[in-house]
Amino acid sequence: MKTILVDAVDCFVSDTGEIYKEMHDLLETYQNKKIILTGANDEQFKKFGLDKMPYEVFTLKHNPEKTDSSYYEKMFENFGLTKDEVIYADCFFSL
């Protein structure tokens, strides 16, 4: 069963720390393990409420940024996963 990777801010949670109910409800329909991905540093982690998430949160504190492929290599290593064992949910909202 694949692990679901979910982008944190503006996908699973707002920049004020509010969990997007629709996304949470959707994810709860799957039995898969879920991991929230972010680049947040310690200050941002608290600001975005990432310390209160219902799933494990992974961050490298902007070192490197998520735009750098080494972020994902380190995340895979941390969780003992490969690219074939995950599905990545990144969201784009029209404001």
Identify what each model region corresponds to.
Residues 1, 31, 54-55:
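Short, well-ordered alpha-helix to beta-strand connector turns
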Residues 1-17:
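Asp-based phosphoryl-transfer active-site loop
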Residues 3, 85-87:
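Structural motif
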Residues 12-35, 69-73:
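Short, acidic loop-to-helix structural element flanking the phosphoryl-transfer center
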Residues 38-40:
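Conserved phosphate-coupling serine/threonine residues in phosphotransfer and NTP-handling enzymes
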Residues 42-85:
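Substrate-recognition "cap/lid" segment bordering the active-site pocket of phosphatases
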Residues 90-95:
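Acidic, divalent-metal-coordinating active-site segment for phosphoryl/phosphodiester hydrolysis
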